[in-house]
């Protein structure tokens, strides 16, 4: 009996093995250079090394293979580019062909998720979410959030004064994470006051960012799509409540409580006041022209009438949750890198403090004063150039067969920008590309010139980060208050250069600083 089944098992094994070898050699068969990795796995194992972030690995491969190369991650095929013309073609010129993001199949189909967020959505649904959400990040909306952000900044300043007393070094990364979580908690998750250094959400969020999803992504990268979806549904039904689900539940409770409060106020004849946070803004948000958007067989470029101009409760949960995930780590890291660079370049820090003294002479700092801090903007831009912390987000998925340069690109191919190489390319930035030089941003039209050439810390094109202005507002408010009272100085615990770690984002292991009180 065993001999009867042996040929069948052998044939199946050979067929499966041949299939994976065929996938593994995809780029080689097309004459595209790149790292091969291992059969079946490709370079998947490289993406799991927390001590050598994958964006830095891509930078090393670019040095070896050039500005365009390919690799496989299981059955996923990725083309890496760092040529500014190709980047502009993918993100802007051919946006209609590359409007999807790079996703692992284990993450599911974003179009079928009730809580799909603006980052993951694509096509018609992305257009609708973007249209409804955009007013939430307008200047007028940010003004309504300003006082909450500044209150959190002043609360952090009190903790800094206490913890750094007596010349003690403090890890600014941890302090900045407390600040950004406090802000997001208050403007997106229904938190009513500051919970800094006692926030019950912090362990949940930290666990989410420190989580190892390697096994899940391995399943998504290796197994056929239909099997991945079956496994995914089983996991969703049987997994214990994880960090992501806990955050969703906290947000959903906050939204339901806000809706209930609004209904009670209306019954009692109480008018709804000015929006206090994202929940209020999203509940009020409408897009007048959303009826012009539509869906036609999944093709976002063809429209039919769709009249739901407001977000559903589930969609509000999705937006608030993704803003927590996107805003917590990235803003804290941007502040951390800027702090490190200022401490290691005291002449630049002194120049920035002079601007702060000049433009913000009074204890109260207004949102209009922030717009006058031009040199501070240059400092943050330059910090994000040298440390593009969210480089993984600069990726796209090919949605239609097309050509990129002279290369044919098939549907399903992932495009990943090597942002670290792009941001320090001497052909773009000059011989001082590796230097921290905020003054390079003071040249006329520098924003337009550099973005066209390849400066993309917040992405590029229609899908550029919607929260960019909020992030800058948070960073400016906090840095103004700190630099008015302290000067950042390195100490015995400061790692120079920084030791970089991470998977989803590239972050320093720590940013220990002395905060020397100013006269």
UniProtKB/Swiss-Prot annotation:
CDD domains: CYP3A-like (cd11055). It holds the Pfam family p450. Its EC number is 1.14.-.-. Its cofactor is heme. Heme binds at residue 465. Keywords: Heme, Iron, Metal-binding, Monooxygenase, Oxidoreductase. Gene3D superfamilies: Cytochrome P450. InterPro entries: Cyt_P450, Cyt_P450_CS, Cyt_P450_E_grp-I, Cyt_P450_sf, Insect_CytP450_Detox. Signal peptide: none annotated. GO terms for molecular function: heme binding; iron ion binding; monooxygenase activity; oxidoreductase activity, acting on paired donors, with incorporation or reduction of molecular oxygen. Cytochromes P450 are a group of heme-thiolate monooxygenases. They oxidize a variety of structurally unrelated compounds, including steroids, fatty acids, and xenobiotics. Belongs to the cytochrome P450 family. This is Putative cytochrome P450 CYP13A1. It comes from Caenorhabditis elegans. The lineage of its organism: Eukaryota, Metazoa, Ecdysozoa, Nematoda, Chromadorea. The gene is cyp-13A1.
